Amino acid sequence: NSARADLCVALAKHTGMSPERMMVADVFSHRFYKIYQLEESLSSILDRDDIFIYEVSGRSAIGENSREDVVLPIYLRERTPARDYNNSYYGLMLFGHPLLVSVPRDRLSWDALYHILLYRLSRYVTRPSSDDEDDGDEKDIEDKDNIPKPGHVAGASSQDSGAGSGGAQLWSRRRKPAPVDNSPGPSHWPQRARRKHLFTLQTVNSNGTSDRSTFNEDTHAQPYIAIDWEPEMKKRYYDEVEAEGYVKHDCVGYVLKKAPVRLQECIELFTTVETLEKENPWFCPTCKQHQLATKKLDLWMLPETLIIHLKRFSYTKFSREKLDTLVEFPIRDLDFSEFVIKPQNESAPELYKYDLIAVSNHYGGLRDGHYTTFACNKDSGQSDYFDDNSVSPVTENQIESKAAYVLFYQRQDVARRLQPQPSSSDPPASPACGSPPNSEFMDVN
């Protein structure tokens, strides 16, 4: 259960960077999904997550900016044709990797920020030549709106414009407002400010859009800045190959096979104390305020028939996906005795043990799919595979698969009570597992 600080200290040994200048962020779909604070736990990071480490000047925390520096999250966007809204918002589509840029507090003007970002992007952005500058001067003299005014994006709709309070001030804090750029307007700026600008700047929310409905009601919230490129300018000056390139470390070549998860581990996690994150606080009925808290679920009594629903779908702010992790579950003797906080009868262990009687499988994705079932005949003990109108016998080692979605267990004392008593004339019962099914009717891969 390491914190961000532990990760930064470990990385400092390999990189020589100061851990105080590191910031850790979870990046998904060209956005910051989460920016980790100094003592925040990293336990929520999954194997499939893309974790970025940034080096910034000053103190390395979004919410703990020094008096001299402000750390700004920066997104890259490209204007798309108005008819293409499949992956864009108001004709602006995110691309590339987001940035965290430390900006001196006394340089919080749009013109200064433009040149700071141009410098930060210098590894993969070509500066205009003198001829380009001359061409840009002629065009900008005719159309001064091309200069990156505070919060303005040329050609954007009124909904996507930064006009108003969202674009007039780059940074404000509840305790002490930062200086606001009160420099003269574009018509009074020196001639160099009317040179050809490669991109424009826009205040956005954490999703990378300017939709006011998704802004936090707190006007002092952390600002995000978008660098908006016109397609022709991006193609001409932005080296996308260089920007997406990276040095592959030797350890990256070893792809670990996704380890299966035991059902017992899932139950342990289900009953473990959970610390609620800041984004999911608990509402206290006494003080009527949201508070940081812990949560724990316990088992008080056990039912005769236990239904376990495996979490097969993952939902985040930006995506939904199907989880295909193999969960290993026992066919018999699933023991819950250690998870019950009020034992009913310690001398009767069958009150806490379960045997599997059925499994519901799901194939497909979130929007559509196909369901099949494994079920055990209570009289014969034979397990069968049900797929629409076909039924096939299966062996126990065929029941466990990545498609398992809902597990049905029966308590052992109930199973014994319901089991028919064979007479002396009855033939012996069939074994618990039959012969393998015909492959023509069954597919459990």
From Swiss-Prot:
Q: Which Pfam families match?
A: UCH
Q: Which residues form a coiled coil?
A: none
Catalytically driven reaction(s): Thiol-dependent hydrolysis of ester, thioester, amide, peptide and isopeptide bonds formed by the C-terminal Gly of ubiquitin (a 76-residue protein attached to proteins as an intracellular targeting signal)
Q: What is its EC number?
A: 3.4.19.12
For region Disordered, the annotated ranges are 127-194, 416-445
Q: Name one process (GO BP) from the record.
A: protein deubiquitination
Localization of this protein: Nucleus; Cytoplasm; Chromosome
| Superkingdom to which the source organism belongs | Eukaryota
Query: Would the keyword Hydrolase turn up in this protein's UniProt record?
Result: yes
Q: Which GO terms describe its cellular component?
A: chromosome; cytoplasm; nucleus
All residue ranges annotated as the USP domain in the record = 1-412
Q: Spell out the disulfide connections.
A: none
One GO molecular-function annotation for this sequence?
A: cysteine-type deubiquitinase activity
Could you confirm whether the keyword Hydrolase appears in this record? yes
UniProt xrefs under InterPro entries: Papain-like_cys_pep_sf (IPR038765), Peptidase_C19_UCH (IPR001394), Ub_carboxyl-term_hydrolase (IPR050185), USP_CS (IPR018200), USP_dom (IPR028889)
Q: Where are the Phosphoserine residues found in this chain? A: 130, 430
Q: What class of enzyme is it?
A: hydrolase
Which UniProt keywords are given for this protein, alphabetically ordered?
A: Chromosome, Cytoplasm, Hydrolase, Nucleus, Phosphoprotein, Protease, Thiol protease, Ubl conjugation pathway
- Which positions are catalytic residues? 362 (nucleophile), 370 (proton acceptor)
Chief location: nucleus
Regions of biased composition (Acidic residues) lie at 131-140
Similarity comment: Belongs to the peptidase C19 family.
Q: How does it assemble?
A: Monomer. Interacts with RANBP9/RANBPM. Interacts with BRCA2. Interacts with CHUK/IKKA. Interacts with NFKBIA. Associated component of the Polycomb group (PcG) multiprotein PRC1-like complex.
Q: What does this protein do?
A: Protease that can remove conjugated ubiquitin from target proteins and polyubiquitin chains. Inhibits the degradation of target proteins by the proteasome. Cleaves preferentially 'Lys-6' and 'Lys-63'-linked ubiquitin chains. Has lower activity with 'Lys-11' and 'Lys-33'-linked ubiquitin chains, and extremely low activity with 'Lys-27', 'Lys-29' and 'Lys-48'-linked ubiquitin chains (in vitro). Plays a role in the regulation of pathways leading to NF-kappa-B activation. Plays a role in the regulation of DNA repair after double-stranded DNA breaks.
- From the Swiss-Prot or TrEMBL record, give the protein name: Ubiquitin carboxyl-terminal hydrolase 11
Q: Which gene encodes it?
A: USP11
